């Protein structure tokens, strides 16, 4: 299992960043490999269950995700299965009037076609994607 953790400082209130990131309809705006979100179901814990349609390394696949932890304006955890099994955690912390947003993703690639890619290539690709996700959220929130 690979693990990636990245953070960024955003000049916007924690509540605004949290609400933007945690709205499933916004995910394709900031997550480069997600091309569609479908079958969204609100959960009693405040989070959601959804299907994310990904395209990675030219391969399209669906990932089913469910929010297992939802602490408004602080933290969410999503467990996902499909082409990739992962635990994605978002952490939101106040920082000098803005927000420190951290994404932590632990994952295992399940699709044989993707597994054939060199592991170091996949890790680097996902590290770059985490950087892009955070930069996209920052750009949207600071616009």
Sequence positions of predicted segments:
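Solvent-exposed residues in well-ordered beta-strands and their adjoining turns
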Residues: 9-13, 53-57, 68-70, 93-95, ...
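Beta-strand/loop substructures that line and gate deep hydrophobic ligand-binding cavities in soluble
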Residues: 79-132
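Glycine-rich portal/gate segments that line the openings of hydrophobic small-molecule binding cavities
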Residues: 38-87, 96-100, 132-143
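A generic structural signal for secondary-structure junctions
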Residues: 32, 118-122, 142
């Amino acid at each position: 299992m690979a693990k990636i953790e990245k953070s960024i400082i955003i000049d916007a209130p924690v509540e605004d960043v949290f609400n933007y990131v945690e709205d499933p309809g916004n995910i394709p705006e900031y997550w480069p490999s997600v091309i569609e979100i479908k079958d969204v179901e609100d959960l009693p814990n405040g989070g959601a269950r959804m299907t994310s349609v990904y395209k990675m390394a030219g391969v399209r696949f669906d990932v089913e995700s469910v929010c297992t932890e939802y602490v408004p304006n602080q933290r969410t955890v999503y467990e996902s299965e499909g082409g990739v099994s992962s635990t994605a955690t978002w952490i939101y912390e106040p920082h000098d009037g803005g927000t420190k947003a951290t994404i932590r993703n632990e994952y295992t690639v399940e699709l044989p076609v993707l597994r054939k890619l060199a592991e170091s290539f996949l890790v680097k690709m996902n590290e770059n994607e985490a950087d892009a996700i955070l930069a996209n959220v920052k750009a949207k929130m600071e616009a």
